[in-house]
Amino acid sequence: MQPTVRPRRSALYMPASNARAIEKARSLPCDVVILDLEDAVAPEAKVEARASAAAAVKAGGFGRREVVLRVNGLSTPWGADDLAAAAAAGPDAVLVPKVNSPADVEAYDRALAAAPAATRLWAMIETCPAMFELMPIAAASARTRLAAFTMGINDLAKEMKARQTPGREAFVPFLSMAVAAARAYGLIALDGVHNEIDDLAALEPSCQQGAAFGFDGRSVIHPTHIAICNRVYAPPADEVTWAAAVVEAFGRPENEGRGALRVEGRLAERLHLSEAHRLLDLAAAIETAEAS
């Protein structure tokens, strides 16, 4: 049984055509490994990569890492076979591209009908039409396996003909709305990749921006990005300390039934109590993960 709160600070894409990369992923400190059959694999290598990815999922050995298989779209020559292989392999989740509507979610869900019940569906949110269907797409989770939004900023930028700037100004409204739609239906929300592989100085403020929006973590394209994502998307120490104080304060007998308290000079309401429990659970899950 999966923990109620699971860290997803870093989700590393690994080309499924590269056996050495897959083996390396078993020892990297990322929270999620995404075996990629789509963008990272050339057309002539996709069939072999599919077999390799399915074998890797079945073999396991990824430890506490969540294992996700990114497939090609149903409209491509490889999509149906990718989904059949994914259903048979039974990863933690299957990441599907270019989800534009609830109908797309339902089509992918039907294609995964033979998968284990625990296998979830993650949707790439990376097109202009998807930006205006965020709530209906998220609502499809009530009747499908849908469990996560993963942002695809590169494809979105291409469709919008938008420039990718350090502050991501063109995409800020969509990033914020994607998180809100995901949260409205209890979904995971992951930010998109940072394209500048060697510019770690620029990665950190971008992650801080994503964390401020409320993303659970970030998809990454290189192992050197993992440490920064893991640090920035973890609950800050001062927030964990305050969360513990909130839980302790509301747990005192004299505060039973009270809706609001003063905790270390700050207002703490009942809504803060539930968030405090979530932060403490997440911090504990991260501590356990990093000790394993």
Give the location of each predicted region.
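Expand to "…catalyze enediolate/carbanion chemistry for C-C bond making/breaking, isomerization
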Residues: 1-292
